[in-house]
């Protein structure tokens, strides 16, 4: 049970790291940003609200 919890936390941490890289990455088209991100003025922006 504890191993599963650690794995879950690690997966979330990695997802956040990847998300931060995507947000900082320059983009030309909206699909380059991945899920739940928009391309605004060449920057991947998280979709909030």
Swiss-Prot record:
Signal peptide limits: 1-21
Keyword annotations: Amidation, Disulfide bond, Secreted, Signal
Propeptide, chain numbering: 22-28
Presence of the UniProt keyword Disulfide bond in the record: yes
Modified residues (Isoleucine amide): 48
Subcellular location per the Swiss-Prot or TrEMBL entry: Secreted
Protein's job: Leech salivary gland peptide with unknown function. It was originally described as exhibiting analgesic function by specifically inhibiting rodent Nav1.8/SCN10A and Nav1.9/SCN11A voltage-gated sodium channels, as well as showing analgesic activities in several mouse models. In a second study, the synthetic peptide has been shown as having very weak activity on Nav1.8/SCN10A at the highest concentration tested (90 uM) and as being only very modestly active at hNav1.9/SCN11A, with a modest peak current size reduction (~19%) at high concentrations (10 uM).
This protein's name: Peptide HSTX-I
Organism field: Haemadipsa sylvestris (Indian leech)
